Amino acid sequence: MAAKEVKFSTDARDRMLKGVNILADAVKVTLGPKGRNVVIEKSFGAPRITKDGVSVAKEIELADKFENMGAQMVKEVASRTNDEAGDGTTTATVLAQAIVREGMKAVAAGMNPMDLKRGIDLATTTVVEAIKAAARPVKDSDEVAQVGTISANGEAQIGRFIADASQKVGNEGVITVEENKGMDTEVEVVEGMQFDRGYLSPYFVTNPDKMIADLEDAYILLHEKKLSSLQPMVPLLEAVIQSTRPLIIVAEDVEGEALATLVVNKLRGGLKIAAVKAPGFGDRRKAMLQDIAILTGGQVISDDLGMKLENVTLDMLGRAKKVTISKENTTIVDGHGDKAEINARVAHIRTQIEETTSDYDREKLQERVAKLAGGVAVIRVGGMTEVEVKERKDRVDDALNATRAAVQEGIIVGGGVALVQAAKKLNDLTGANSDQDAGISIVRRALEAPLRQIAENAGVDGAVVAGKVRESADPAFGFNAQTEEYGDMFGFGVIDPAKVTRTALEDAASIAGLLITTECMIAEKPEPKAAPAGGMGGMGGMDMM
């Protein structure tokens, strides 16, 4: 086992604080509408340029192991805030640095670290309640756009795109962000249910120009297993031909003779037909087939339920006004499903969302809700270069998460003003002893740090700005760093989601409390490396050619 290096008390805390400062100083330059970029070297390709706090934090690893421990703890603040709220990572980092810095000074002055932490926790709880009380619901798409704009470092176009996408898909909808190959950023809304499976043969195409199969007023057969032979389906196919409607087969797979027969019938014009694979895998495939069945008013033909293809009749098939199938995707528009059954299915999936502990499962379940009840919007982010596209995509992701958070818990004044106003609630708060009071004072001072940093990044004296905002009796009065004006922040459209600000403070105080109460640090001692072997001796008596 390798030898360990152990550091205690002041020595340990000083090294840890140095690491905290290095990481926080790198992250906080990105804060606010006039925040600067951070350029990150990549092992291959162009460097990455970003204004996303958590992306910067994740890249930082320090050579000194004790300093690195401090940096990693603050990195945890950014990661936790990003996981919970999806934005506010820079604010959380700035708050954590401010609390740790003040807390370390208090510990060095001889105060009890445990009482300091109790005071910090007490103050944090009070401020969180004040933030929740100050929050108000999002009224309209303009406010959604404002939240998105602020989170995207002041780019109004991004805020507008997100507001448009939210309006089109509704509260149940899902918005995803992708990179666009062109220069323009655009929003594409998919109506109905879309899943990522395309036609099994290009011979099913009805529109050769676009290479898609467009089938209107179609029947949909949902089969859980593979189809290798069409013999059991002959009675059903004859009924479909008599109805003169198209048929879409959605099955685990359609192969061999079955696929060949379908293609021949399609080419001869006897049958308007297309076949696609069922979406998903395993249990998720079964669930998604059931979703399609409920949306289209059909049934899933399953051996588990004792159903046989020979016995399938037209009334067991799903129906849809239009089905569009491309090489990669299938979209079902206006399914004939019963509204009450669709709502019951959505409620059932929502219950699963609440119960699941897996983020991946939660995301997939939310997508299923969106496909049944709302819609799916895709924001395709464009730019002149790949580096620019990636930088903008980071900001669109942040803005999207911020708008979701705003819808969940409401909005408060932005620009760091809400924290400064909430700090006034701490004026009358007292702890059980003087050390706890010191912990409360630490939080009171730290709450001004984000506002100061936003001002300083805009080239203005942070202390002067914080003083003016603190003295104002108007809770909405603040400093708009974009225009460098003082006034009503709601009027300026500078608003933040309450959830983001609350989460940032809670996570910062939690990790800062742990750092302040650290008394000992243990790290592996670097092993001395052996000196490299000497070079080969000269070879005397040989003439050089």
Swiss-Prot record:
InterPro entries per UniProt: Chaperonin_Cpn60_CS (IPR018370), Cpn60/GroEL (IPR001844), Cpn60/GroEL/TCP-1 (IPR002423), GroEL-like_apical_dom_sf (IPR027409), GROEL-like_equatorial_sf (IPR027413), TCP-1-like_intermed_sf (IPR027410)
Database matches in SUPFAM superfamilies: GroEL apical domain-like (SSF52029), GroEL equatorial domain-like (SSF48592), GroEL-intermediate domain like (SSF54849)
Annotated keywords: ATP-binding, Chaperone, Cytoplasm, Isomerase, Nucleotide-binding
Organism superkingdom: Bacteria
Catalytic activity annotation: ATP + H2O + a folded polypeptide = ADP + phosphate + an unfolded polypeptide
One GO CC term, this protein: cytoplasm
Compartments where found: Cytoplasm
Single annotated GO MF: unfolded protein binding
Pfam families in the cross-refs: Cpn60_TCP1 (PF00118)
Subunit-structure text: Forms a cylinder of 14 subunits composed of two heptameric rings stacked back-to-back. Interacts with the co-chaperonin GroES.
Function: Together with its co-chaperonin GroES, plays an essential role in assisting protein folding. The GroEL-GroES system forms a nano-cage that allows encapsulation of the non-native substrate proteins and provides a physical environment optimized to promote and accelerate protein folding.
Name of the featured protein: Chaperonin GroEL
Lineage: Bacteria, Pseudomonadati, Pseudomonadota, Alphaproteobacteria, Rhodobacterales
